[in-house]
C-alpha cells in the first residue's frame, strides 16, 4: 500500500494536448472562442483570452507572456500583474483557463482531471509559441505545480525564456492529504471532508473570480498536480 501511494499520478490524457497545426496567429482567437463555447457558461471576463501588444495590428512579438492560474481561481486571479509585465515587455499575453474553473456552475470543478489541466497547460505553451519567439510563463499556486512538471519536459517547455512562480503549491498542508492521490481517494475524501469544500469570499470580486464552493472530488487533481511536480 505504501508503494502505491508513492507512485506518480497516472497521466491518462483524455484530451489531445497542444494546438492543432492549422491554427495560425490570425485564427487563434476564433479557435479559442469555439473551444470555450463548449465549456459551459463562463463567468464574465474569465474565458481564455489574448491581449495583443498592438491591438490595431495583432502580430507576433519577440516575447509572449502566458498566465496559468491556481486551483479554484481563474484567469483574473493576479490581474493586472500579468498585463503590466506584458506591457513592459511589449509582449502579447495569453490567459488560459484550466478546465472546470471560472464557470457559472461550481460543480463543474469536480469533473476536471489532472490530464485536463496538463492539456490546458500544453495548449497555453503552444499558444505562447504562436504569439512570440520566446515565452515568459507566470503561474500561481497549483498552476505553478503544473508548470514545474512541464519545465522538466523539453518538448513541452520549448522556447520558454523565463518563469515566474508565485506561491507555488509544492505541498498540501492538511494532514492525510496523501490519501487524495491514492486508491479510493474520492470515497475517503467524502468520509473525511464531506461532499463539498469551499471558503467564504471576502468581497464580490473574490466571489466572481474564484469558485468558492465545489465538490470535494476537485481536490484530487489538485493533489495529483502537487505530486506531479515533486
Task: Please describe what each predicted stretch is.
Residues 138-147:
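Gly/Ala-rich beta-loop-alpha elbow adjacent to hydrolase catalytic centers
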Residues 97-102, 169:
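Short beta-to-alpha linker loops that shape the active-site pocket of alpha/beta-hydrolase fold enzymes
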Amino acid at each position: 500500500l505504501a508503494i502505491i501511494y508513492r507512485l506518480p499520478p497516472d497521466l491518462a490524457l483524455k484530451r489531445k494536448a497542444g494546438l492543432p497545426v492549422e491554427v495560425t496567429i490570425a485564427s487563434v482567437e476564433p479557435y479559442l472562442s469555439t473551444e470555450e463555447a463548449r465549456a459551459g457558461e463562463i463567468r464574465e471576463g474569465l474565458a481564455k483570452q489574448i491581449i495583443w501588444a498592438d491591438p490595431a495590428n495583432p502580430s507576433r512579438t519577440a516575447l509572449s507572456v502566458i498566465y496559468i492560474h491556481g486551483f479554484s481561481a481563474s484567469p483574473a486571479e493576479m490581474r493586472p500583474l500579468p498585463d503590466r509585465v506584458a506591457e513592459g515587455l511589449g509582449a502579447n499575453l495569453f490567459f488560459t483557463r484550466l478546465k472546470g474553473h471560472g464557470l457559472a456552475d461550481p460543480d463543474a470543478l469536480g469533473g476536471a482531471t489532472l490530464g485536463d489541466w496538463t492539456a490546458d497547460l500544453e495548449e497555453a505553451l503552444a499558444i505562447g509559441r504562436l504569439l512570440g519567439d520566446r515565452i515568459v510563463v507566470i503561474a500561481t499556486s497549483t498552476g505553478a505545480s503544473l508548470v514545474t512538471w512541464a519545465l522538466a519536459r523539453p518538448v513541452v517547455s520549448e522556447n520558454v525564456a523565463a518563469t515566474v512562480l508565485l506561491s507555488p503549491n509544492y505541498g498540501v498542508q492538511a494532514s492525510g492529504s496523501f490519501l487524495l492521490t491514492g486508491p479510493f481517494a474520492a470515497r475517503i475524501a467524502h468520509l473525511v471532508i464531506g461532499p463539498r469544500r469551499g471558503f467564504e469570499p471576502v468581497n464580490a470580486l473574490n466571489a466572481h473570480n474564484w469558485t468558492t464552493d465545489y465538490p470535494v472530488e476537485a481536490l484530487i487533481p489538485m493533489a495529483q498536480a502537487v505530486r506531479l511536480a515533486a
